[in-house]
Regions:
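Glycine-rich beta-strand-to-loop/alpha-helix junction loops that act as flexible
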Residues: 8-11, 181
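Short glycine/serine/threonine-rich phosphate/pyrophosphate-binding segments
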Residues: 12-17
Length: 181
């Protein structure tokens, strides 16, 4: 079976994986953990954790469970409390991260529960923050601010050096095909 590694964030990566899982492939998704918007952004600030939202979306896309379970993971609370706009799957990943101390271990646990087709790995266990440098020499910190700015980007980097997980590096080395989404 061909080993396919797909690297990316939540939206594009999730759509691609929904299609790829229909083929006889050994899929590994390596997911960015630099998201800082919405529920993920709040959880990052509150619990000092890496981003979990894109991981949640990838878990749902590779899962082979009842549609109700997918709906549960994607469910967002609509309330006037602190839970407002939090995704249930993000809360679950945050709890597992606090229990295991590792995104990789959290994903391994949820992958078993959700009958995941393939493997999901975080790009890093570090708290990655994106920094964009624009064509007009502006510096924008944070993925959500970069998106909202609508500026022409010269280059992007992390605010500080991050360590790629050993599992992600190993998956890339063993891949027959690498896809960027």
């Amino acid at each position: 079976m061909k080993k396919v590694v797909v690297l990316g964030g939540g939206t594009g990566l999730s759509v691609l994986l929904r299609g790829l899982k229909l083929f006889p492939l050994d899929i590994t998704a390596i997911v960015s953990v630099a998201d800082d918007g919405s529920s993920t952004g709040k959880l990052r600030q509150e619990f000092n954790i890496p981003a979990v939202g894109d991981l949640r979306n990838v878990l749902v896309s590779l899962s082979e469970v009842e549609p109700l379970v997918e709906q549960l993971l994607q469910y967002r609370f609509h309330t006037s409390s602190d839970l407002n706009n939090h995704a249930m799957g993000n809360l679950l990943l945050t709890a597992l991260y606090n229990i295991t101390g590792s995104l990789t271990k959290s994903l391994e646990s949820l992958s078993k529960i959700l009958n995941i087709k393939g493997k999901i790995l975080p790009f890093t266990e570090d708290k990655a923050i994106l920094v964009a440098h624009t064509k007009d020499n502006e510096t924008i910190i944070g993925e959500s601010k970069i998106t909202k700015a609508g500026k022409k980007i010269d280059y992007i980097e992390y605010e500080h050096e991050v360590k790629v997980t050993d599992q992600a590096l190993e998956a890339v080395k063993k891949a027959d095909l690498i896809v960027f989404s």
